């Protein structure tokens, strides 16, 4: 009957999502720490360049992340898994918020590689490209209020090379990873925010309520 066919189709889709999520998680779980240079390119819906920047990413599982834009302006996003700091150098402003590990709203947290969380938040498909040398995973958010319509992660020999996402307005952002170093020890101090000493009138906005 129609209803049973619908259930079977749903089950097949769920199994495909979980299978792709497990395959993606298996790759990500090989990496406990990650350091990389990231070239960021954002295009509008017509393919025109909106912004180009260079950032430095440092991550340590489960939820420690340092994302520092170094060009053409300076900005730092840092989390220790409890709080998240955002420092805008030009504005001389620091905002502090409670950390949220919702991977449907923060794509970089996909790199934490928890299969169940990925499958809960995204429909997932996988595809081999360039004669099998590139493995790409395409993720479509399940939540209607997701900030992104579509995301993809590409790997070569298990190393992350590219991450792309598209928002509801058709704006596309591509992150290209280079100088990737995985599973090397990271100084714990990297994930401790230090108030800049060279700023005279630093504005601090603390939204944590801690």
Label each residue range with its predicted role:
Residues 23, 28-81:
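N-terminal mature ectodomain segment of secretory-pathway/periplasmic proteins
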Residues 95, 115, 119-204:
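Gly/Pro-enriched, hydrophobic low-complexity segments
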Residues 7-11:
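Boundary at the C-terminal end of the N-terminal hydrophobic targeting segment
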Residues 28, 105-119:
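Short, solvent-exposed helix-to-loop capping segments enriched in aromatics
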Residues 41-43, 87, 170:
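Hydrophobic lipid-interacting interfaces of membrane-associated proteins
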Residues 208-210:
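Short, solvent-exposed mixed-charge patches
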Residues 56-107, 173-174:
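An acidic-aromatic
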């Amino acid at each position: 009957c129609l209803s049973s066919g619908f259930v079977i189709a749903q089950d097949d889709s769920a199994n495909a999502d979980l299978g792709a999520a497990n395959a993606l998680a298996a790759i990500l779980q090989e990496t406990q720490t990650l350091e990389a240079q990231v070239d960021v390119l954002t295009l509008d819906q017509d393919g025109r360049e909106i912004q180009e920047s260079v950032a430095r990413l440092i991550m340590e599982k489960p939820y420690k992340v340092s994302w520092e834009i170094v060009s053409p302006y300076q900005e730092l996003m840092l989390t220790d898994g409890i709080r998240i700091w955002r420092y805008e150098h030009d504005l001389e402003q620091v905002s502090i918020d409670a950390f949220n590990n919702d991977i449907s709203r923060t794509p970089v947290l996909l790199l934490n590689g928890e299969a169940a969380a990925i499958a809960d938040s995204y429909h997932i498909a996988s595809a081999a490209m360039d004669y099998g040398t590139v493995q790409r995973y395409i993720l479509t958010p399940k939540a209607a209020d997701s900030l992104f319509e579509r995301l993809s992660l590409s790997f070569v020999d298990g190393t992350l090379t590219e991450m792309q996402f598209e928002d509801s307005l058709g704006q596309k952002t591509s992150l290209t990873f280079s100088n990737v170093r995985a599973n090397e020890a990271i100084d714990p101090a990297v994930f401790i925010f230090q108030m800049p000493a060279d700023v005279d009138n630093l504005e601090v906005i603390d939204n944590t309520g801690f």
